[in-house]
From Swiss-Prot:
Residues annotated for S-adenosyl-L-methionine binding in this entry: H14, T16, G41, E62, D87, N103
InterPro entries xref list: KsgA/Erm, rRNA_Ade_diMease-like_C, rRNA_Ade_Mease_Trfase_CS, rRNA_Ade_methylase_Trfase_N, SAM-dependent_MTases_sf
Record Gene3D superfamilies: Ribosomal RNA adenine dimethylase-like, domain 2, Vaccinia Virus protein VP39
Descriptive protein name: rRNA adenine N-6-methyltransferase
Function recorded in the entry: Involved in erythromycin resistance.
Amino acid sequence: MTKKKLPLRFTGQHFTIDKVLIKDAIRQANISNQDTVLDIGAGKGFLTVHLLKIANNVVAIENDTALVEHLRKLFSDARNVQVVGCDFRNFAVPKFPFKVVSNIPYGITSDIFKILMFENLENFLGGSIVLQFEPTQKLFSRKLYNPYTVFYHTFFDLKLVYEVGPESFLPPPTVKSALLNIKRKHLFFDFKIKAKYLAFISCLLEKPDLSVKTALKSIFRKSQVRTISEKFGLNLNAQIVCLSPSQWLNCFLEMLEVVPEKFHPS
């Protein structure tokens, strides 16, 4: 008996073959016939073939040349499927609202998150992502050291749906996996200043062991820190990494109101 030939994936992707997982991912993403959905790392189309039955438009993105050819043949008659052969990091993300349902290449998880939840915050509505369990855990740490993680939680509701076993993939990964649900929050925020907000978070997290009081005093006056504490219920003695996403955003918006622009972090 000959061995089944497995695709070579330098970015660490393992193909989803679990139909229950696929169904759960699509259901969690709340896909409708009005949605444009990206399948990042589409592989052999295991997810795409289910998405095309529900979504208005599916964009299957794949970097492996042989698999791109396979996808184009497989979906040649599908009017609502577009196959794009490229590394997702070079993909021209839609300039209109879209969702993602994807078993992403594990090796570029951080890049994918930044592209979706920071660079394309304006149009990324959310979705479901199958990814390595370890980076998923870091998203839900009680203390948030990574400025991007704070940023993501500010604008998105993130939910770890469940852990996924290696038997759900081909080839089976040696690491644990998870299904992550992402849903953008309804916030009144000027997306044009998202980089300024990230700079604010990054500045205050440069010394993560500092207390909230000491960290805020690098930007605000002492009296302003006291006012902010009372206004937003801050524990000034806690570490700055213990602030909640809503507290981060409130502090930032307060900075825009009371601190001259020349003192804003950049």
